[in-house]
Amino acid sequence: MQYGDKTTFKQSLAIQGRVINALLMREIITRYGRQNIGFFWLFVEPLLMTFFIVMMWKFIRADKFSTLNMIAFVMTGYPMAMMWRNASNRAIGSISANLSLLYHRNVRVLDTIFTRVLLEVAGASIAQILFMAILVMIDWIDAPHDVFYMLIAWFLMAMFAFALGLIICAIAQQFDVFGKIWGTLSFVLLPISGAFFFVHNLPAQAQSIALWFPMIHGTEMFRHGYFGDTVVTYESIGFLVVSDLALLLLGLVMVKNFSKGVEPQ
């Protein structure tokens, strides 16, 4: 294939795959290095944070305040919230860290954002699977009621993380100050992510407000998959899917618009 030749769809997919793979390897080496455990920090980092939260709940004997397994409650809410929060935070610096690579015609701004979000989602996913498996094996939590339903919820929230990452990156690219304060703003959003409460326990008026937030539907859905009918949840898969697609479309349009003004350095 010569420069300027048109490629088939299959060839374009292969090229895109190589670009993403190369960006992933570069990101991993840049962030974690080649020494010590290197790549394994990808999921050790979120795993350790989740471990700290779980142990805190374990030693304050949260079971005294509820008949619900509070460790399972934390595991089905906090890691998912941290996934989209960390993904959006990491997306902000994706372009500045890869400006020199944009000289390559096959590397686009969108690729750099997607790579960072993918890395965060992968790390959070591996940590979640490993830690939940360990907790089930040592009998601290029960086995999930419906794993498939949980996987669908996790996938939809991974889509949300990607869409949010695109939007936040686009805004931060236009307004530098936003990129600096988003870390704090995203932390403030954690309490309304559904990670620390069930919608069912809120007053009726608060429930109607809470259900306008897509991440609450993802958390409720994930917990429904884990606890089954032992808890009352209010998720709407349709609302979450539509929200994800709308945010994704908005994010892609915003990235496309500002990408035209990004110059390689």
Curated annotation (Swiss-Prot):
It is a multi-pass membrane protein. GO terms for cellular component: ATP-binding cassette (ABC) transporter complex. It comes from Haemophilus influenzae. PANTHER family: CAPSULE POLYSACCHARIDE EXPORT INNER-MEMBRANE PROTEIN CTRC, INNER MEMBRANE TRANSPORT PERMEASE. GO terms for molecular function: ABC-type transporter activity. It is found in: Cell inner membrane. Belongs to the ABC-2 integral membrane protein family. The keyword Ribonucleoprotein does not apply. One of its GO terms (biological process) is lipopolysaccharide transport. Its main location: membrane. The chain crosses the membrane at residues 37-57, 64-84, 118-138, 151-171, 178-198, 235-255. May form an ATP-driven capsule polysaccharide export apparatus, in association with the BexA, BexC and BexD proteins. This is Capsule polysaccharide export inner-membrane protein BexB. Keywords: Capsule biogenesis/degradation, Cell inner membrane, Cell membrane, Membrane, Polysaccharide transport, Sugar transport, Transmembrane, Transmembrane helix, Transport. It comes from the Bacteria. Residues 37-258 form the ABC transmembrane type-2 domain. Pfam families: ABC2_membrane. InterPro entries: ABC2_TM (IPR013525), ABC2_TM_bact-type (IPR047817), ABC_2_transport (IPR000412).
